[in-house]
Structures are given as C-alpha cells and as structure tokens.
C-alpha cells in the first residue's frame, strides 16, 4: 500500500458519516452500512468481511466488471488484521426480494426486461470463466423501469473447479446437488428459479408450509424431477421459457447464453 493511497483512504474515512436512516441487510459473510461522503454528499456502501471469510475473487470480479453497467462499482478495497473493507456504489431502490414482496408478482413485460438484463450480466461474467454461484432475488438490485445490478460476488467461482453445496439451497441446480464441477449451468438454473418467482410469486419447489428442517436437499432433488405446474394466466412463451430453464435433464435445458437469449420469451 503506497503512501499516496494511504493518505487518500485516510482522508476519505475522515470525511464520511454512517447513515443510520438507511438500513441494509447484512450478507452471510459481510456486514454492510450506508455511508455519506460529507464534502460531495455522495452515498456509498461500506462492506466489512471478517478475515476468515475473505476471498480474492470478490475484488477481482469488481475489477474485471468495472466498466459493465450491470455490476456494482468498487471504489476502495483494503484489508486489516480483522477484516476486508470494500467501499461500493450505493444503489437506491432495493433488491428484487423486497420488490416482489411488495408487488406479489411481476408482469411478463417487466420480468422480460429484468431477466434480459440479467442474461447479459451473467454472459459478461461467464466470458471470464467465472460464475456468480449465488444468483437469487436478494442479490439483484433493481431501479424500477431503468436497470438491474448484479451484486455480492463473494461466492463467485472459477468454471470447472471442484464444487461444494455452497450458496443458497433453494437455487441449487441438479448438477450442483450432485457436486459436479462448477459450470455456467449453475447460474442459468438459478435464473430460471428467479424468473419463476417473479412471474408466479413464489418458489417452484419450496412450499409455503415447508420449514427449514423439512426442506432438505433430498426433498429439493425429488421435487426438481417433477413437471412444473402450468399456469393459465401465463403466455405460451413464458410457460415454455420456465419449462425449458428448469428442465431436470440438462440435455434438454436452456443452459447457455445463446439458447437463453434467443428464446421467444426474451426476443
């Protein structure tokens, strides 16, 4: 860490103030708060990750995707004896989880826009042989009628490395449950789950009366093998898209950028 950077970061931290009126939900491994840079009035997110959970991949993804509009901009990254601190762009508007909770379900037109943008974001990340590995409603920030931001890169993984059942179990693909090597299909399956949640208003495999003890990975795997329920209020294109994204047999599933983006629901 050179002297100029130390001086700059010390000055920045001397000029910020925590905004207690803006609440953020902490992630699995990091605590987050909104801070205001007093001289400019700009809001940032300060993310602190305990040193035992720190990985090199999160700052790397920020660096690789720094010019991509669908990813969060990183301003500063520094590591102390106890934690890694990231200073990130603050995006007003909240995440898709809160948005869906408020609106119950989302129109096909708005879902198409959201999913189309996520498809482009994932393809950009995959071009570096990196998967997000934890795509879910909570990890997509949404400025309504404008754009999405894919966030939280702490569980990103390199394609074709050995996998484990990390991430959020409700979004795990059949292949991930079988502990096959990490591949892009992990993210495309999760996108199918997310699309279903937006259009239908609930998860395709987790029932409202499930508790965490009953809904284990074996139950999830059994339910994934059953055909999806058909909904008459969906268009034929939307129904076919969900079925193709969540086909249990990967040989018949949409699990590449080219097949996803060309589907009639998105085109």
Swiss-Prot record:
EC number: 2.7.11.1
Family: Belongs to the protein kinase superfamily. Ser/Thr protein kinase family.
Segments forming domain Protein kinase: 18-266
GO molecular function terms noted in the UniProt entry: ATP binding; protein serine kinase activity; protein serine/threonine kinase activity
Originating gene: PK1
EC class of the enzyme, as a word: transferase
Protein name: Serine/threonine-protein kinase 1
The species this protein was found in: Heliothis zea nuclear polyhedrosis virus (HzSNPV)
Catalytic machinery residues: 134
InterPro entries, alphabetized: Kinase-like_dom_sf, Prot_kinase_dom, Ser/Thr_kinase_AS
Residues passing through the membrane, by range: none
Reaction(s) this enzyme catalyzes, per UniProt: L-seryl-[protein] + ATP = O-phospho-L-seryl-[protein] + ADP + H(+); L-threonyl-[protein] + ATP = O-phospho-L-threonyl-[protein] + ADP + H(+)
Magnesium found in the keyword field: no
Binding-site list for ATP: 24-32, 47
Keywords carried by this UniProt record: ATP-binding, Kinase, Nucleotide-binding, Serine/threonine-protein kinase, Transferase
């Amino acid at each position: 860490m050179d002297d100029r950077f130390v001086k700059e970061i010390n000055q920045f931290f001397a000029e910020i103030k925590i905004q207690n009126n803006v609440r953020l939900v902490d992630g699995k491994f990091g605590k987050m708060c909104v801070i205001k840079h007093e001289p400019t009035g700009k809001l940032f997110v300060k993310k602190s990750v305990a040193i035992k959970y720190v990985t090199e991949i999160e700052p790397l993804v920020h660096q690789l995707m720094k010019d991509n509009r669908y990813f969060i901009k990183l301003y500063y990254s520094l590591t102390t004896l106890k934690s890694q601190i990231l200073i990130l762009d603050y995006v007003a508007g909240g995440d898709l989880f809160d948005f869906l909770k408020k609106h119950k379900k989302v129109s096909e037109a708005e879902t198409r826009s959201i999913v189309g943008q996520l498809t482009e974001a994932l393809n950009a990340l995959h071009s570096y042989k990196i998967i997000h590995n934890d795509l879910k409603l909570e990890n997509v920030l949404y400025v309504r009628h404008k754009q999405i931001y894919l966030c939280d890169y702490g569980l990103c993984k390199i394609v074709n490395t050995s996998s484990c059942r990390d991430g959020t179990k409700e979004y795990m693909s059949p292949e991930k449950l079988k502990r096959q090597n990490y591949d892009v299909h992990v993210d495309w399956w999760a996108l199918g789950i997310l699309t279903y949640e937006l259009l239908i208003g609930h998860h395709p495999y987790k029932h409202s009366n499930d508790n965490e003890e009953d809904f284990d990975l074996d139950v999830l795997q059994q339910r994934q093998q059953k055909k999806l329920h058909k909904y008459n209020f969906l268009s034929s294109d939307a129904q076919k898209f969900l079925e193709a994204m969540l086909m249990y047999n990967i040989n018949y599933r949409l699990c590449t950028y080219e097949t996803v983006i060309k589907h009639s629901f998105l085109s």
